Each structure stands twice: as C-alpha cells, then as structure tokens.
Curated annotation (Swiss-Prot):
The active site is at 152 (for autocatalytic cleavage activity), 190 (for autocatalytic cleavage activity). Keywords: Autocatalytic cleavage, DNA damage, DNA repair, DNA replication, DNA-binding, Hydrolase, Repressor, SOS response, Transcription, Transcription regulation. Residues 26-46 bind DNA. It comes from Maricaulis maris (strain MCS10). This is LexA repressor. InterPro entries: LexA (IPR006200), LexA-like (IPR039418), LexA/Signal_pep-like_sf (IPR036286), LexA_DNA-bd_dom (IPR006199), LexA_repressor (IPR050077), Peptidase_S24_LexA (IPR006197), Peptidase_S24_S26A/B/C (IPR015927), WH-like_DNA-bd_sf (IPR036388).
Length: 232
C-alpha cells in the first residue's frame, strides 16, 4: 500500500516519461508535489524503489524506470508501460557476469577501495580487486573504480554502494565531479567549483555544506566518467 504522496510521485514520473521520454528532475518532482525540499523527493523515491515500483538506472543522473503501477492506476493504462525504448536519458544496464564472448569488448579496471560521498574518509587505498567494464567507457587514459560510501551526491544520481569509474587526472574543469584529496589524507567525491582564488567542493545534497579550500590544500586525483550500479 502506497501513501498518497508516494502514489502521486509514481504517477507523475510515469506520466512524464510517457509524454517526453525523460524522467522529471528533482526540482520538477519537488514542485509537482509541493514538497519543501529535494530530500523529501529522495525519501519518496527510495520508498518506491524498496517496494518494487521503480528502479534507478546507471550512467545517467535522471534515470528512473517505472516497473509497475498500483492496481487502481494500472487498470486505466492502455497500453501497458513500454519495455522497449526508455528515452534518451536512460541506459539499460546488465551487470551480471558476462559470458566469455561478451568479455571480448570489456576491459578490466582496478578497484581502489572506497570513496566518501559524504564526510571525507581516509585516502584512496591500494588496489583491492579488478572488474570488467565496457571498453568504450574507458577509451584513452588510465582509469580506476571506487565504491561510493555516503549520500552527499544523490542529486547527481550517485548513490551509496554505487561503483564510480574515474579517469585519472590532476586537473578538472569547474563543474566536473572529481575525486579530491584534501591535505594529502582525506579523499572525497564532490563537484569541483573554482571561485576566485579558492576551490569549492560541492555536494549534490542540500543536507551537506559546500567546503571551500585554498588551492594548495586540494589535489584532483581523477574525474568521474561513468557509474555502475548492481541490482541484487
């Protein structure tokens, strides 16, 4: 049984995808349901996902798929929810262990431990494992993976437990999501903003404050180029 707000949000998402092929943004969902904050939208989406009504897909920030509707709403649906093209913002993912022939188009990437999307944790660890990714995701440069710990980047579509694919680099453009090393001891995943003579590390969750540092305290370790989410 869904609450009234959960039901309203589910139908709003479903109708928007049917009309435009694109999932609504957090701002649009907040406005449609007249919620006070985006964190309220996140809680509703999490509840719908836990109940099996929607799922969040990898690679894109605005990537929601409606799996089913409440019986009262589904009875009026003709045709049924499409299972084919989900729109330009959705990439279907299949992260099961690939068959031998499928691995011909994959590349093994080192897993370097966990990265904080929240309060910074200890600096990046040594290689703990390797995992396959599509070769076209890592064309050029050196790449590595990190498991996300925390919820400070949820509005960028990055959730606790996701694996982020990072291209190693020492600089980034303002607005890029980066792995930043603070004072050579704390690693965190944040959006980089260059403000005058300072560097801002910006969360994608209103519950976290932007942190501002002089440039010599922050070293860019890499830039986000992909994301993998596994469904169990």
């Amino acid at each position: 049984m869904l609450t009234r707000k959960q039901n309203e949000l589910l139908l709003f998402i479903h109708n928007r995808i049917k009309e435009t092929g694109v999932s609504p943004s957090f701002d649009e969902m907040k406005g449609a349901l007249q919620l006070a904050s985006k964190s309220g939208v996140h809680r509703l989406i999490t509840a719908l996902e836990e109940r099996g009504f929607i799922r969040r897909l990898a690679h894109r920030a605005r990537a929601l798929e409606v799996l089913k509707l409440p019986e009262s709403a589904a009875a009026h649906e003709t045709p049924a929810i499409p299972k084919g093209d989900l729109g330009a913002n959705v990439v279907r993912g299949n992260f099961a262990k690939p068959e031998p022939d499928a691995r011909e188009n994959t590349v093994d990437i080192p897993m370097l431990g966990r990265i904080a999307a929240g309060v910074p944790i200890s600096a990046i660890q040594h290689e703990t494992d390797r995992f396959p990714v599509p070769a076209d995701m890592v064309m050029g440069g050196e790449h590595f993976g990190l498991e996300v710990k925390g919820d400070s980047m949820i509005e960028a579509g990055i959730m606790d437990g996701d694996t982020v694919l990072i291209r190693r680099c020492q600089s980034a453009e303002t607005g890029d999501i980066v792995v930043a090393l603070i004072d050579d001891e704390e690693a965190t995943l944040k959006r980089l903003r260059k403000k005058g003579g300072s560097v801002a590390l910006e969360a994608a969750n209103p519950e976290y404050e932007t942190r501002i540092f002089p440039p010599d305290r922050v070293k860019v370790q890499g830039r986000l180029v992909g994301l993998i989410r596994r469904y169990h």
